[in-house]
Amino acid sequence: MEEIRVSPDYNWFRSTVPLKRIIVDDDDSKVWSLYDAGPKSIRCPIIFLPPVSGTAEVFFQQVLALSGWGYRVISLQYPVYWDLLEFCDGFRKLLDHLQLDKVHLFGASLGGFLAQKFAEVTYKSPRVHSLVLCNSFSDTSIFNQTWTANSFWLMPSFMLKKIVLGNFAKGPVDPKMADAIDFMVDRLESLNQSELASRLTLNCQNSYVEPHKIKDIAVTIMDVFDQSALSQEAKEEMYKLYPNARRAHLKTGGNFPYLCRSAEVNLYIQIHLRQFHGTRYAAISPEMVSAEELEVQRTHLSNNSESEDES
């Protein structure tokens, strides 16, 4: 089954949103690939960061829907970085190149971990205004592979793919989830050995998020109630780390809800971003927001500032 690859939505996405390639490092082999849709006048867009197996295409349903509603959306895939600080430095340079001062980040699995680490590393000069963390984690030790992290670069491609596929859902799943898995397997096949090895290294290198550095960032935690690669323990850890986070629970969706439950995921992203309407950190064009919604947002903001003044 290759339903997603031949779907009208995916073909429309591929034919209307150009893929850009950007180099920001001295090393010309480090190329960021990204799709940038929606109004370029928006200076605080939402940026999507994929999981180990993903490419920039895996968020095509979010790119199409959100840009259609007036949001600026960037979906990207990483160059080969072997170290978290190296990744954070490269991502900061990319934001500088795109002339983006602050951004909202949606990260899936590894993408969510990298989003948190980037927010943490840049906390003294903040670049992240908010986070949506989908099926994500805060400590790489949950994978029990920190001891192998330094040997991924030696492994052949087929072994690395086997490691990743081991986390995909097994057993019966509904047709949409089956299509999502097929599409992700196809995306996994498109990654070369160094791309996969470097992502697995970042995913398993001994590291954890320091929450006190990013405590002022608005967070939504999005997870699924059915089978995913994340243990219940890892989910509970995220809730503890971000006690004030909004929670977006999906009954089903597996590892890739942004593909197989895109309508629900898009709605939760909208709800998350709505709190910034009418501010300089809005990810949406002001003309696309109804006057009524802006008024509600202004009232909400003024109430918040009043309650802060009282406290």
Curated annotation (Swiss-Prot):
Cell location: Cytoplasm
Domain AB hydrolase-1 residues, every copy: 86-159
Record-linked Pfam families: Abhydrolase_1
Cellular component terms (Gene Ontology): cytosol; trans-Golgi network transport vesicle
Gene: spg21
Location (main, coarse): cytoplasm
Cytoplasm among keywords: yes
Protein name, entry field: Maspardin
Recorded superkingdom: Eukaryota
UniProt keywords, alphabetically: Cytoplasm
GO molecular function: CD4 receptor binding
Family to which this protein belongs: Belongs to the AB hydrolase superfamily.
